[in-house]
Amino acid sequence: MLFRSGIETSCDETAAALVMGGYDVVSSAVSTQVDLHAEFGGVVPEIAGRAHLDMLNPMIARAIVEAGVQESRIDAVACTVGPGLVGALLVGVSAAKALALTWGVPFVGVNHMEAHLYAAFLEDPTDRKSTRLNSSHSQQSRMPSSA
C-alpha cells in the first residue's frame, strides 16, 4: 500500500502527516505556536512564517519516522495552498513542492476550508453536504462521494 504525505502551515500550527489508502492517518506530527503569539493577543503573520521555517522539517521527519514508512512508498505530497497567511503558506508549499520533486511524485494543492470538511468524513464518508463557518471564513460545499 502506498502513502500520501500531507503538510499544513496556513496559520499558527505546523503539521505533517502520512495517510494510507486515503482515509487511514498513520502518523501526525503537530507543532503549535500558541505560546509564541500569546503576548501579542493574536497571530503575528511574520512570526508565524518564521516559526514554520524552524519547525516544518522536524515535523515531516517525525511523521515519516512514526509511520515507519520509507520515502519510496510515498506516492504524493499534499499541502494547504489557501486560504491562510501568505508567508506561512509559502513555507509549506515550497517544502511540499521540493519533496514532490525530490521523490518524483505529484504535488497536490489542498483548499484549507475543504480539508476541514473532508476531515469530518474520515470515519464515515457517507453524506458530504456541509457548511463550514467561523469568524473570518464561510463556505458551503457539496463534495462528490469517492465511492
What residue spans do the PLM features occupy?
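Single conserved hydrophobic/aromatic residue that forms the stacking wall/gate
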Residues: 1-2, 129, 133-147
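Short acidic/glycine-rich loops and adjacent helix/strand connectors
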Residues: 3-132
